[in-house]
């Protein structure tokens, strides 16, 4: 099993319990940073400290072209202990109504999920906000001052490597500091 390396609670605790309960090999990958935290030789707490500590590793990684890799493996053929759901063909509202969640909490209207929405938001921010991010990032009244990409990054809907590479192409050093720490 391959999972995201998340050294924060409760995720770290969940992973420890999973490791204790299974004999399945588990690989944790830090996919949220250009330079994974385990490569640092010391702890840092400020974005500029991280930048300084990772300068050489960062420079060798951030401008590399992304190479698409074909996955060459057998399809999983065993029986599942549940009926699979094809999200392309199902009625999402019916499916969601069956979830054990608080249905009184409405969706966030201006933050639709998915990669397409995430990259649309990123493209808009690149055009309207990235160049002035350093100036407007702490001004809550400036709507285009921040990227509002956190949910898309946190839940894996967009690639932090792609975002970092594209921000780097625009010379957005302060945005990269905030993205990567």
Protein language model annotation of sequence segments:
Residues 44-181:
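Glycine/tryptophan-enriched, flexible segments
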Residues 2-70, 171:
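Trp/Phe/Arg-rich N-terminal binding region typifying the photolyase-homology
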């Amino acid at each position: 099993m391959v999972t995201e390396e998340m050294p924060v609670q409760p995720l770290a605790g969940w992973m420890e319990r999973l490791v204790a309960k299974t004999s399945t090999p588990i690989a944790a990958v830090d996919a949220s940073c250009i330079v994974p935290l385990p490569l640092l030789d010391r702890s840092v707490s400020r974005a500029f400290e991280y930048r300084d500590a990772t300068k050489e590793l960062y420079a060798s990684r951030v401008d590399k072209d992304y190479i698409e890799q074909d996955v060459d493996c057998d399809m999983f053929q065993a029986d599942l202990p549940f009926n699979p759901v094809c999200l392309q063909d199902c009625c999402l509202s019916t499916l969601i109504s069956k979830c054990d969640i608080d249905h009184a909490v409405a969706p966030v209207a201006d933050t639709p999920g998915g990669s397409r929405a995430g990259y649309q938001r990123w493209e808009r921010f690149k055009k309207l906000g990235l160049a002035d991010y350093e100036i407007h990032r702490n001004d809550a009244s400036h709507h285009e001052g921040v990227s509002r990409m956190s949910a898309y990054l946190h839940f894996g809907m967009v690639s932090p490597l792609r975002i970092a590479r594209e921000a780097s192409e625009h010379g957005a050093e302060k945005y990269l500091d905030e993205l990567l720490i």
